[in-house]
């Protein structure tokens, strides 16, 4: 698929990973990327195509990569990391013939990702090494990493773990994820001065040591059916606390992901689906 975002016609591919949905644009022909206004209109579910994020395919930035991609949230802002998006980009590149073989590398705004095709619709992505130091998240007001932080938020104390997966995450452990105050607490933490770059907020329920249920309130989007980097963040925070095993199944409203982390300086590996929905053309 190719795109010309300034002539009125925009060809795209609609995809999703566990319900986290994307509009994929190929900008490798030199077409300039969409500005924030156009990205927000394209992502609008009533007046545009509708998606959580827009993924733009671009020429690689590193020698080992077959292509690069950037991420636009539905409000027009940028994101540094998107695990479900990485799998969808990988599947798109395989279908278009850009990626040869079952193992290859793609560049995200955050880092270069090693990708492996496990079968026709399932991919694993090396998501990078999690960063727990507050300065790297970033999380203001704390000098050293902790398993649990506490912040006073509108008269209540919110307790959470925090980690960067290339983007900031707070993880709130709850007894029942279905009853979690996702929108209320998610929005409050995103607006809190302790998170100078805002934050993705996950609400995680440990079902058993090999299974976690999760809902995520994302920056620039709101609650989504799935968040790949959020699943990684929840898993590693819970692994760090000894609450779950090093290989865990994460159930989100839109589907399931598998997260593996050997510990400390190892990369987190996420596996899950990448689904083509349709190809289309949008008349702006």
From Swiss-Prot:
The gene is dapF. Substrate binds at residues 20, 53, 73, 83-84, 167, 200, 218-219, 228-229. The active site is at 82 (proton donor), 227 (proton acceptor). It is found in: Cytoplasm. This is Diaminopimelate epimerase. Homodimer. GO terms for biological process: lysine biosynthetic process via diaminopimelate. GO terms for molecular function: diaminopimelate epimerase activity. Catalyzes the stereoinversion of LL-2,6-diaminopimelate (L,L-DAP) to meso-diaminopimelate (meso-DAP), a precursor of L-lysine and an essential component of the bacterial peptidoglycan. The record marks 169, 218 as: Could be important to modulate the pK values of the two catalytic cysteine residues.
């Amino acid at each position: 698929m190719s795109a010309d975002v300034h002539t009125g016609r925009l060809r795209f591919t609609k995809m999703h990973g566990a319900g986290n949905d994307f509009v994929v644009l190929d900008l490798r022909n030199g077409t300039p990327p969409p500005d924030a206004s156009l990205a927000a209109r394209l992502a609008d579910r009533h007046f545009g195509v509708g998606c959580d994020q827009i993924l733009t395919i671009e020429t690689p930035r590193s020698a080992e990569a077959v292509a690069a991609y950037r991420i636009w949230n539905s409000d027009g802002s940028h994101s540094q990391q998107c695990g479900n998006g990485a799998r969808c980009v990988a599947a798109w590149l395989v279908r278009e013939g850009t990626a040869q073989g079952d193992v290859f590398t793609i560049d995200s705004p955050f880092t270069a990702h090693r990708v492996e095709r496990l079968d026709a619709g399932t991919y694993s992505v090396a998501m990078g090494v999690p960063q727990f130091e507050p300065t790297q998240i970033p999380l203001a007001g704390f000098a050293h990493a902790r398993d649990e932080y506490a912040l006073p938020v509108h008269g209540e104390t919110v307790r959470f773990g925090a980690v960067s997966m290339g983007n900031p995450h707070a993880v709130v452990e709850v007894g029942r994820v279905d009853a979690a105050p996702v929108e209320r607490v998610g929005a409050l933490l995103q607006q809190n001065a302790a998170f100078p770059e805002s934050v993705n907020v996950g609400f995680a329920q440990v079902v058993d040591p090999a299974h976690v249920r999760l809902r995520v309130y994302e920056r620039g989007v709101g609650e989504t059916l799935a968040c790949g980097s959020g699943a990684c963040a929840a898993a590693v925070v819970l692994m760090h606390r000894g609450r779950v095993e090093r290989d865990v199944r994460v159930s989100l409203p839109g589907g399931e992901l598998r997260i593996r982390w050997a510990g400390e300086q190892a990369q987190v590996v996420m596996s899950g689906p990448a689904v083509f929905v349709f190809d289309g053309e949008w008349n702006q």
